[in-house]
Amino acid sequence: MSSSAGISRRRFLKQSFAFSALASFASLSQKAVAFSNLASAAPQDAFAAEILMIGDWGYDSNHAGQTAVAAAMRKYAQQHGLKPEALFFLGDNWYGDLTGGAQSSRWQTQFEELYPASEFPGLAYAVLGNHDYQMAPADVNKVEAELHYAHSGKSRFTMPGRWYRFQFPAKNPLITFLALDSNMPEGDGAGGRKPGTDRRGFIVMTPEQKAEQLAWLEAELKKPRTTPYLAVLAHHPVYSDGPHGDHTTLIHDWDPLFRKYGVQLYLAGHDHDLQHLEFEGHPTSFFLSGGGGADLYNLKIQQSQRGPFANKVYGFSQLSVTKEKMTLRHLDSDGKLLHAFSKTPSGKVLIAS
């Protein structure tokens, strides 16, 4: 390990984990963390259940980023002999107009053809992003269009509702997912905004929907655990080193529940980059995959300040799950491995970076 890499990791440990000078690996009150070299990152496991994921992908103008990332996903799966049992689409599925709604030609050209069933035969689970609400209902209500397309029975695109629960894989499940709508009404109608819009003027969920979802979330988290892992996915990150920053509403409403019920993983997009954040004493690993095709954003906080990983880059991510551990990887638009970590059911984290 180079000295510069060592300094970066020590800074990260001081910031996020109260670094102990007594050992090269941090031993923490609720989370054990170790580092390994990226070159020796956990190899592909033939017995793992596999998921590939992207966020912020359905751009309405320049499709070069989306096309490159989709091609890298297909090539990566072929090279490693993967047949992912699911894809995750972490919101901002459609930017701009979706003319024709559920019958729009964009479904074929930007979803079915770029992520073909021949390469990705599993279901494609999706959550709603702010751009999915954007412009609705001025032209086409994209939220309703996505729900309608998912319920048509003609596609792998899966969205049973604005929020929903599923287990993965379908046979002998290893992980329970709670998929949420993170488009929050932030002081509805305040600051001269139109009622029912966020700070950017985008349509959002109603206060009643927000309350209903929050009650549903806690009820689901209270249920007896039947899988080794519990994860939540939504579009907006709770914490982010990108320009959107930390989300005060989600920190207030969701983060206490994640801590209380021991949610092990939170998946998000929204900031157009790839991130992985860990915090001292927090049971949740925060994993952001927003490099699916939309224009990239500059980071606001560098990974040396808060990490362990943040990179302004197009790319996709992989989640591999076994009984012993779940492994998450960030890869760029060439399929190059940028960052990886594994986490056991007890919460021990091994970071390769």
Q: Where are the regions that the model predicts?
A:
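Short acidic, glycine-rich surface-loop motifs adjacent to enzyme active sites
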Residues: R225-D241
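Conserved beta-strand->loop/alpha-helix structural units within folded catalytic cores of enzymes
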Residues: L87-N93, L233-H236, R259, V263, ...
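Extended active-site neighborhood of metal-dependent phosphoesterases/phosphodiesterases
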Residues: R74, Y95-P228, G245, T249-L265, ...
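N-terminal secretory signal peptides and thylakoid transit peptides that target proteins
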Residues: S2-A23
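N-terminal active-site segment of His-dependent metallophosphoesterases
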Residues: A34-S105, D241
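C-terminal segment of classical bacterial N-terminal signal peptides
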Residues: A26-K31
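A short C-terminal boundary segment appended to hydrolase-like catalytic domains
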Residues: F309-S353
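Short, well-ordered beta-to-alpha junction loops that form the rim of enzyme active sites
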Residues: N130, S182, L233-P237, H270-D271, ...
